């Protein structure tokens, strides 16, 4: 079930939340998507008249939470120690009682076990959030199944919801799809200055005439950089001599970085492939590139960055795994006239090379049309406003049970 503006749960969600105390439990996070989501939900709760608490070990959140009307509660949400998890259950019971919590939303799979038991003891509704890909293996212990034991279970995509139904057969009637939200105001191409773009290209060391194929992802096997290197060799063999491939991300392990360098030499493309660190200015990087590629090897490799690239209108290529079809519209799943990017089979360098060449060959009008459709598709499904509205609708539904 996808909660949207037309859903009865999307209307008037603020009414049952006014005056309620909502506790979010999140693991320590770096600055990025998870942290932004927590802050956005906190701000939305405050606007509805609810009292918003956030239990986490991330002290960096404390100041920002207070500025938007939230309250910080120190809580070791990321612990995997069974004894510590038992103590967490007792901590949560005390927090729920002392703060008169009406509903708990846990975004940490490890804290879910404690939250399930604390909420049952307190007779409070619980919302849980699944991992981004819905989970990759059948759970064997109560610690692993707890994330699907909420009164309502949030999945970040239809793909994740479908996978969860297979892993957790008892969840279908409790599953709700709430897609990630992004601050689209920061992903407007007109807001990216020429100076930012030129600075990015200078950082990469590319010449003015060179077109860039960018892979903005952590360099790990699941992200598929090997496939891109092999595809680069095929692109080069087709006579395209003005293309540079930029791998913008930190290596998961130094040995893997060396393996990638060795593969580039083996494929004869070491002169056109450059490894750089993670981009300090992703919007400028997307605009500076002719094509942005995400050659993920599996569902785990479909990242938030692919949504951001599509949101700003970059010509985006994604492996056809996980939730990729929800991000990109492309044949054969959609009509060619509806194309917003390219979907390619994972681990197939030839298919990736074909998509890169097709994107690079587009004329100006066709390229602009793909970009407009891409921006519109992402804006309709992945806005911060939609995410907060749909999340609060799940809270309201849980409280009205």
Report the location of each language-model feature.
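A conserved mid-protein helix/loop that constitutes part of the nucleotide-sugar donor-binding site
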Residues: 32-40, 211-234, 245, 258, ...
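Short hydrophobic beta-strand element within catalytic cores of glycosyltransferases
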Residues: 54, 315-318, 325-329, 335
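Short His-centered aromatic/hydrophobic patch
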Residues: 106-112
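A conserved, positively charged/aromatic
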Residues: 120, 126-158, 162
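Nucleotide-activated donor-binding/catalytic signature segment of Leloir-type glycosyltransferases, i.e.
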Residues: 249, 257-277
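Acidic donor-binding loop of glycosyltransferase active sites
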Residues: 287-301, 314
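Conserved acidic donor-binding segment of nucleotide-sugar-dependent glycosyltransferases
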Residues: 329-349, 359-364
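A short, well-ordered alpha-helix in the C-terminal region of glycosyltransferases
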Residues: 366-381, 390-393
